[in-house]
Amino acid sequence: MSLVGIRPAKLEDRSLIRSISERTWPSTYGHIISKEQIDFMLDWMYSDESLAGQFEKGHQFFIAQLNGNDIGFCSVSKSDEGQGDHKLNKLYILPNIQKSGAGTALLFKAIEIAKAAGSTSLFLQVNKHNNAYEFYLKKGFIKESEFKFDIGNGYYMDDYVMRLSF
């Protein structure tokens, strides 16, 4: 069995982060939202400019590696609401590598970052129909609320807000 490695991402990793997103989103969201909405959201969240802005705002990205291959990433940041918590903004693993322990390793890294900063919880948003919802429940997250967020062009994010307290 191979161990999953985690490394900090750099600004120069934007194309890698975009590439992993482009390979994970169709299988993650293709049964939930249209291809047009997937394309819109990928451009909105994973363009070079958008990712550069996220790095600039203090989002910390980490890359998961297995056998020397980059297989996923996560992003964690201090909460914008100033509630003394952190937000897991993104966590994606290539479809053929899921259930390898990489998602858990990235989640543990995000928790480590939040705890080291003095936060008492980690929260996230997950689409109501995303299989990752069950993953987060198994890891101890609690569904806190749900909301439908207008992201423009007639598209919505229909999410649960989940929180892990520590």
Protein language model annotation of sequence segments:
Residues P8-R14, R18-I97, L107-K109, I113, ...:
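Acetyl-CoA-dependent GNAT
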Residues Y92, K128-N130:
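Active-site-proximal loop/turn and secondary-structure-junction residues that shape catalytic pockets
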Residues S2-G5:
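Extreme N-terminal starter segment of soluble prokaryotic enzymes
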Residues F123-N127, L137, I142-D159:
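Conserved catalytic-core motifs of GNAT/GCN5-like acyltransferases
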